[in-house]
């Protein structure tokens, strides 16, 4: 009988210990002790650069549509600043170095196109003068205009009238040259405007990368001072 009581006591003790272990293994929702410790948020705060870039783009797209070249250059500069704010730090540096390498070439091409445009414009003026003179000479010969010199009337000589066919050919050639020069000048103007826009975009992008934001708590664009060389 005593051994039976001892065995029953041992069974009750083991059952009680097992229930205690199961109770401790449970996590109570209302128990503040079982809650994990609270930590300060260590994740990096989202950058405000995309918001600034969006505001710059909104500024570039508002108001006028860029009818003049100055307004188009302004919008290109705004777009470049927005692009600089939106790009990653490494991508900014890569674009900056590429822009520094390509800008001298663009400026050289721009100077060459301006010289070519000046030559074509001068040729256009000369052709216009030749076309005007030949037109006046041909018209005077056809109308047999007489000039009065010292009280005596002088008519255009016959040999000059015989030059009318040649003058007509010269007039036609000068007119055709004027048309070709005008078309070439328009094409050069478009190329020059495009290169000017590219130069403005690349210079604005580099300025945005180099810029130290005194109005933004003196924090540079990339978070550290960039060398200017």
Swiss-Prot record:
Its main location: host cell. One of its GO terms (biological process) is symbiont-mediated suppression of host innate immune response. The keyword Membrane applies. It is a multi-pass membrane protein. It is found in: Host cell membrane; Host Golgi apparatus. One of its GO terms (cellular component) is host cell Golgi apparatus. Plays a role in the inhibition of host innate immune response. Interacts with host OPTN and thus inhibits the recruitment of TBK1 to the host Golgi apparatus. In turn, downstream partner IRF3 cannot be activated and IFN-beta production is impaired. This is Non-structural protein P8. It comes from Bluetongue virus 13 (isolate USA). The lineage of its organism: Viruses, Riboviria, Orthornavirae, Duplornaviricota, Resentoviricetes. The gene is Segment-10.
């Amino acid at each position: 009988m005593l051994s039976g009581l001892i065995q029953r006591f041992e069974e009750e003790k083991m059952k009680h210990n097992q229930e205690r272990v199961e109770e401790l293994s449970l996590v109570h929702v209302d128990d503040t002790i079982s809650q994990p410790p609270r930590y300060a948020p260590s994740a990096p705060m989202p950058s405000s650069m995309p918001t600034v870039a969006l505001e710059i783009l909104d500024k570039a797209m508002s108001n006028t549509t860029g009818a003049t070249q100055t307004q188009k250059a302004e919008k290109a500069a705004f777009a470049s600043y927005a692009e600089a704010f939106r790009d990653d730090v490494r991508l900014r540096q890569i674009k900056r170095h590429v822009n520094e390498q390509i800008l001298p070439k663009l400026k050289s091409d721009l100077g060459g196109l301006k010289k070519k445009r000046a030559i074509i414009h001068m040729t256009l003026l000369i052709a216009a003068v030749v076309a005007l003179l030949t037109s006046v000479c041909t018209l005077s010969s056809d109308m047999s205009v007489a000039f009065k010199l010292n009280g005596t009337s002088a008519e255009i000589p016959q040999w000059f009238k015989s030059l009318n066919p040649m003058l007509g050919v010269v007039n036609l050639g000068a007119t055709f040259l004027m048309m070709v020069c005008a078309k070439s000048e328009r094409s050069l103007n478009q190329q020059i405007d495009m290169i000017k826009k590219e130069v403005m975009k690349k210079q604005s992008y580099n300025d945005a990368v180099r810029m130290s934001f005194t109005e933004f708590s003196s924090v540079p664009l990339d978070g550290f001072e960039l060398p200017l060389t």
